[in-house]
Amino acid sequence: MAIDSRALGPSPSGAAPPAQPLRRSPSGATRHLPTSGEEVKAIAKPNPGILVLLRHGESTWNLENLFTGWTDVPLSDRGVQEAVDAGRLMKEARLRPGVVHESLLLRAIQTTQLALAKMEMSWVPVKRSWRLNERHYGALQGLNKKQTADQYGEDKVKLWRRSYDVRPPGLEPSDERHPLHDPRYSTLPPELLPSTECLKDVVERMLPYWYDAIVPDLHLNACVLVSAHGNSLRALVKHLDGLDDQEVVELNIPTGVPRMYELDGDLRPRSWRYLGDPDEVARRAAAVKAQASGSKSSST
């Protein structure tokens, strides 16, 4: 595949990639940005190029073995290093995202900031949406994973965590952990805010954002970065790769490792790969798989 050179940085020879031309009307005036799907389609590149998915690094609650979900916690020291390493890997691959999409949660925001800083691209515009948030774990949020497994049984907790369409117990609207009480969601209709979610719910809330926000940016930019979470990225991979419900349940996305897709003009993946050392990628993926069984430390 011929990758759009605008997605890449300078070549080894030092020559800069060609600049993206301004769109101008016949009179020479700069053309307005497209506002409709038809306008976007009309100016779409023959090859939209590259989509990079990045799962945030380890958080402090991952380190403490607590269910996190929509709870807003920062990266741990290890998570900070994972984010910096992700930026280094993207820089070494000469990726130059034109825009970043991320969730409203701090651990994803920090991952984006650290990665872009390492790439010397902190100026890249960032768009945020609750639709890219981690899966909401309901009443499990803030609970110790091992203690929860001891209380309810490992099989029950594994079903809550890794099934496609089974939700954990929900939060009451009066519970301070409910997103109704979080100011960052104050402008959203209350009926959109979950009290708990299964992976199927995450797929259903993520897809409108894919079509309405990410797809137009893929047509306008040679490279787009999505910085999010294990379950919101699994939802996106399910759509991109055409995975069935069981396949996506078994999918394990490692933390802090860029997953790079090369797309055709119809936004179908031509190929994908993880950046970085294959052994390290396999180790992190295996760690995520072990976490699903209730072992310590999970990036959820």
Q: Would you name each region that the model predicts?
A:
Residues A117-R205, N252, R270, Y274, ...:
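Phosphate-handling substructures
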Residues A2-P21:
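N-terminal chloroplast transit peptides
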Residues T60-L63, R107-T111, R135-G138, P168-G170, ...:
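Short catalytic/ligand-binding loop motif for oxyanion handling, primarily in non-cytosolic enzymes
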Residues A2-R6, S27-V124, R128, L132, ...:
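Active-site-proximal alpha-helix that buttresses catalytic centers in soluble enzyme cores
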Residues P278-T300:
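Short, cationic low-complexity segments
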Residues K41-A44, T60, I109, A117, ...:
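Active-site-adjacent alpha-helix immediately C-terminal to a catalytic or transition-state-stabilizing loop
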